Amino acid sequence: MTDVPYGRGGSPLQNLIVRGHRDTMMTALRMTNELDAGPVYMKRHLSLEGGSAEEIYIRAGMLSMEMVVSLVNDEPDPVVQEGEVTHFVRRTPQQSELPVEDMSLESVFDFIRMLDADGYPRAFKTIGGLKLEFSRSALREGKVEASVAISIDGENDNAND
């Protein structure tokens, strides 16, 4: 889900959004012993704008199917990756804590939506002994609106892991 060699590694969607990217490339590449380092068969544009991570993954899945058809029909020759390699590290559940200091509303919105998919620890903020988990965010009329699930801090930490 990155324009390799930029973005090799883990949590590509989250690492792209947290760095301010608004679009990326879906890349079909040959598997090698080194992660995401193989030659590239094709790349296709994928918007990261709006919507939750889940919605972006659905769009990426549909685009992947189109790419598979093209790979089978066109049999492109793979091309060696060129350019500076940038590695992404898989995000940890602790990195899902919303760092609200010095964040714009758009950054808060992006942070919540980039984690809003099954299997990902939701964006959260701990206040006192309460853990607030955010999902289904929207940026409207100068504010971020989101669903919030409130639990006692530490009681449901493995719910989305």
Indicate residue ranges for each PLM-predicted region.
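A generic structural signal for short, solvent-exposed coil/turn residues
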Residues: 20, 32-34, 90, 116-117, ...
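Donor/substrate-binding cores of folate-linked one-carbon enzymes
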Residues: 1-87, 94-97
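Short low-complexity stretches enriched in small and charged residues
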Residues: 88-92, 103-105
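An anion-binding loop in the catalytic cleft
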Residues: 99-161
